[in-house]
């Protein structure tokens, strides 16, 4: 349930949207030919939706209920590099995703923990991979 009046909620949404866009250097995606802005917008809106949830609630991440406060904290740590990483992962995913919203929430939640290992694996593959 959303507390307050509709204008209050809209203002809160706009404030979170601006904050998230600032964190991820949103304007840098405007001219990025590798990233579709609609994809970035979808991620931003999904994060905004979570930011509006009450802290005492839970969000399902990879099938596990996580405290909203922890998910919000994780989302607020995401930056431009994390969003690029998520978009790269999405583009290279070849398996069918049944619930795209759940998949994106999990990807956003895990991005800060998995980005370093992902790029290490990519470099190792490029340097020492199958030839």
Question: Model-predicted segments: where are they?
Answer:
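Electrostatic interaction modules used in gene-expression and signaling proteins
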Residues: 1-131
